[in-house]
């Protein structure tokens, strides 16, 4: 028996699951994967969501086929009656659920549920406010190049439960994990944990910064002396305050990957973090350097879209935080015309005043959050504002000079005008490739 929360004991062993009734909250890909895995383990399942419209046809067909109990509607105590365990999908805030069920009910993440069903796979888990997808992708590429079989999943696309259900097994599982996924992890213990950085983010979901940091550090809280934690310099105090037991290594750019095609010092640091993890599992330095040299920058992450009339257009739509904006600005020596704006998530924009003054010639704002940027930088740099990204791109393209960079680095979420950062980045690329052709 293992204690996972609230001083209560739940066994996660396979043969114990028929004893439990589990509420799976949320019907996206993570919720569906958790439900399918629980069904295979013999648990009784109740699917909970606010509305039937959220459920895909595939999932609804599966629910009917398996006769799982379903409850739709606003969250209420009745949804959690007779429930032993709640598995919330990432993005479902716990503070919206907990008022509706007793403290004796255990909260478990889909990731932890699946992790406990693994066999002998080594696990590399990566989190951080910025950089985690690049590090996870680099880890996977290095391992594959070394001839080591890999599953890559978590926040990067495929829930771990889907891997557990498939018959093909691998040597190493690489997981990118968000604070949403980690917050409900109590036992999770990867062999290697990487935390790229922690800066203000998701305070619309977490109650405060302390809760956000605590969620992130769940990635290494349960590690012991035989495990490895790879952390960014500046996180030394957290090792003591959270009483981390793992071997701790702090990574930085050591110049090992100077031939990388990735823009920015932060990406060279990401390569170092990936290399430290993979070296632990037998990847040679030669292989690591080969991978980093040929590694293509990921979409929406300092993605060079087009060189038009001597102006380089760069898409960093994934950069939704103040620290991501800092890293993007530090990646260029050329003068920058900065595109920023959206739904502001918090952070100290005034901390960027020195680099804005040094590196940026004009700031082109679009969408919401105009006042945050104007208050922070309005006295040191020209700022324009347009309602849409397309209008802002057109304006800056008329103002740009040969040899300059027009950089989309919003420092905000996209939810004021777009479904997500991907839709925003794709719209930017459409504008650069299609609209500017007509505009020129």
From Swiss-Prot:
Its EC number is 6.3.2.9. One of its GO terms (molecular function) is ATP binding. InterPro entries: FAD-bd, Mur-like_cat_sf, Mur_ligase_C, Mur_ligase_C_dom_sf, Mur_ligase_cen, MurD. Keywords: ATP-binding, Cell cycle, Cell division, Cell shape, Cell wall biogenesis/degradation, Cytoplasm, Ligase, Nucleotide-binding, Peptidoglycan synthesis. GO terms for biological process: cell division; cell wall organization; peptidoglycan biosynthetic process; regulation of cell shape. It holds the Pfam family MurD-like_N. It is found in: Cytoplasm. It is an enzyme of class 6 (ligase). SUPFAM superfamilies: MurCD N-terminal domain, MurD-like peptide ligases, catalytic domain, MurD-like peptide ligases, peptide-binding domain. It comes from the Bacteria. One of its GO terms (cellular component) is cytoplasm. Its main location: cytoplasm. Pathway: Cell wall biogenesis; peptidoglycan biosynthesis. Gene3D superfamilies: Mur ligase, C-terminal domain (3.90.190.20), Mur-like, catalytic domain (3.40.1190.10), NAD(P)-binding Rossmann-like Domain (3.40.50.720). ATP binds at residues 128-134. It catalyses: UDP-N-acetyl-alpha-D-muramoyl-L-alanine + D-glutamate + ATP = UDP-N-acetyl-alpha-D-muramoyl-L-alanyl-D-glutamate + ADP + phosphate + H(+). The keyword Cytoplasm applies. Belongs to the MurCDEF family. Cell wall formation. Catalyzes the addition of glutamate to the nucleotide precursor UDP-N-acetylmuramoyl-L-alanine (UMA). This is UDP-N-acetylmuramoylalanine--D-glutamate ligase. The lineage of its organism: Bacteria, Pseudomonadati, Thermodesulfobacteriota, Desulfovibrionia, Desulfovibrionales.
């Amino acid at each position: 028996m293992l204690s996972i929360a609230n001083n209560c004991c739940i066994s996660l062993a396979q043969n114990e699951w028929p004893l439990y009734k589990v509420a799976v909250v949320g019907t996206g890909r993570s919720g569906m994967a958790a439900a399918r895995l629980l069904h295979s383990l013999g648990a009784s399942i109740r699917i909970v969501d606010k509305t039937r419209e959220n459920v895909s046809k595939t999932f609804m067909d599966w629910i009917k086929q398996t006769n799982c109990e379903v409850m739709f509607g606003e969250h209420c105590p009745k949804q959690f009656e007779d429930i032993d365990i709640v598995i919330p999908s990432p993005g479902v805030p716990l503070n919206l659920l907990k008022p509706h069920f007793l403290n004796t009910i255990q909260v478990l993440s889909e990731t932890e549920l699946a992790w406990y069903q693994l066999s002998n796979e080594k696990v590399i888990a990566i989190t951080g406010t910025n950089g985690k997808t690049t590090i996870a992708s680099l880890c996977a590429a290095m391992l594959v190049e070394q001839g080591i079989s890999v599953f890559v999943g978590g926040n990067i696309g495929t829930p771990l439960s889907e891997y557990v259900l498939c018959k093909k097994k691998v040597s190493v599982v690489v997981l990118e994990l968000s604070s949403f996924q980690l917050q409900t992890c109590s036992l999770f213990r990867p062999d290697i944990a990487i935390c790229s950085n922690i800066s203000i983010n998701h305070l619309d979901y977490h109650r405060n910064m302390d809760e956000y940091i605590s969620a992130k550090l769940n990635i290494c809280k349960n590690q012991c002396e035989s495990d490895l934690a790879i952390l960014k310099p500046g996180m030394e105090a957290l090792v003591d305050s959270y009483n981390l037991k793992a071997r701790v290594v702090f990574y930085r750019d050591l110049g090992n990957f100077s031939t990388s095609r990735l823009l920015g010092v932060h990406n060279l640091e990401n390569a170092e973090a990936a290399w430290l993890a993979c070296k632990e599992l037998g990847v040679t330095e030669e292989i690591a350097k080969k991978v980093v040299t040929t590694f293509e920058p990921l979409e929406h992450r300092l993605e060079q879209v087009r060189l038009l009339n001597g102006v380089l257009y760069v898409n960093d739509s994934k950069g939704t935080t103040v620290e991501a904006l800092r890293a993007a600005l530090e990646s260029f020596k050329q003068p920058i015309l900065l595109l920023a704006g959206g739904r502001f998530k918090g952070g100290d924009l005034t901390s960027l005043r020195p680099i804005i003054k040094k590196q940026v010639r004009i700031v082109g704002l679009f969408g919401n959050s105009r006042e945050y940027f104007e208050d922070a930088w309005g006295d040191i740099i020209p700022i324009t504002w347009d309602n849409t990204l397309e209008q802002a791109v057109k304006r800056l393209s008329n103002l740009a000079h040969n040899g300059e960079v027009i950089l989309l680095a919003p420092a905000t979420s996209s939810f004021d005008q777009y479904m997500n950062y991907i839709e925003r980045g794709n719209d930017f690329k459409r504008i650069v490739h299609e609209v500017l052709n007509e505009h020129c």
